[in-house]
Amino acid sequence: MSILIKNVLHKDTITDVLIEGNRIARIAPNLTTPEGAEVIDGTDKAVIPGFINTHTHAAMTLFRGYGDDLPLMEWLEDYIWPVEAEMTAHDVYVGARLACLEMLRSGTTCFLDMYMHPLETARAVEELGLRAHLSYTLFDQGGAERAALDRKRSYEYYEAFKAFSDRITFTLGPHAIYTVSGEQLQFCHKFAVEHNVKINLHLAETKGEVDECVRQHGLTPVRYLEKLGILSEHLIVAHVVWVDDEEMDLLAKHRVSVVHNPASNMKLCSGYTFKYEEMKKRGIRLGIGTDGCSSSNNLDMVIAMKLASLLGKAWRFSPTATKAADIYHSATIGGAEILEIPAGRIAEGMLADLSLVDLNVPELVPLNSLTSNLVYATSGSSCIDTVIIDGVIRMRDRYVLGQEEIIAEAREVARRLFGHG
């Protein structure tokens, strides 16, 4: 299948973009329309790479607005985990479909997820056409029996994911160092190396986590992981607010990827001094995440970019920190590098994972800088008009096929879980 986008803005130039199969084939003005190609009029639109959300919990869209304004551990132990214990696999599927819809409508084409029932999330992703790396979440607080079950399920899920399209990739998701034992973390590392998959881990999110790690192990979180021998290019760590210079050196040395989640870090008061500039100087691969809707309330990567940029400026008292271009890079190319996919750029040979931005929305006028306008002036749900993933149109004219049914079913499940939807 071919798609030709005509007269679209790309790098300050009006041009055409030809998609053949699932790749961007040509970028040039006045391209000839291939026989049978679908033509999209790009007038008054800009083509941009799809955003890559490198940390979220998709099905937690169902928790939006529940348990707000609470500290992390009270929020988890008294609000989130009790409801999750009541959720069915179908609930996860419904919440994940709502998440995929929300991400499509705000220009996200790929995401890294961590949640229970990953096959249900995979089913939702398959149906709505996104690209995703989906983690099986491991906890072993239940002792040796639970740890053994998680190891068994890791192998089972790895095999089960082979039934899905190549847009969907299996990863391991040990929840955190305070919910997963050192032995289980070492299992995850061994599994990741043997099967060439990623490990998705919360790390150094709060000061309390760091203090408890020092109390239990005599080491801060990053040093603890180094002692366990699991720092590697397979590891993706989210939050990483409470780290020192030596720990950042270790992350860089072992090619660990780091994901900044500004919304949840601020909302839960986990910490705000994310050391973006220091990590960037060390060559650490940096991504941007929305986190789940239970802690950030939306999955809009455009809003996440604005928060990441402004937060970095605010705590440093430096208007030149966390520049719009750098944050935009982390939300696109940075995410692609972390997940090792040929995406994140509008260039010939790249995956056709892209969005068309409506340049006629008021907050994008005038267009002195598209990058600055995207990071500082708008939201994805306001300005994204069309989304193409893997060479297939998944949203056009702000409409996703079946969106009414997705929203209605999510409301029904939320009413059962929370009493209202």
Residue ranges of each PLM-predicted region?
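Active-site microenvironment of metallo-dependent hydrolases
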Residues: 1-15, 19-20, 25, 30, ...
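Divalent metal-coordination and catalytic microenvironments
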Residues: 8, 22, 44, 55, ...
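Active-site gating loops and adjacent loop-to-helix segments of metal-dependent hydrolytic enzymes
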Residues: 62-94, 128-143, 148, 155, ...
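Alpha-helical scaffold segments that flank or form the walls of functional sites
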Residues: 64-130, 153-164, 411-419
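Metal-coordinating catalytic core of metallo-dependent amide/deamination hydrolases
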Residues: 120-241, 246
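Histidine/acidic-residue-rich catalytic or RNA/ligand-binding cores of hydrolases
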Residues: 207-219, 247-249, 269-279, 296-313
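His/Asp/Glu-enriched, well-ordered alpha-helical/loop segment
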Residues: 227-234, 276-361, 375-379
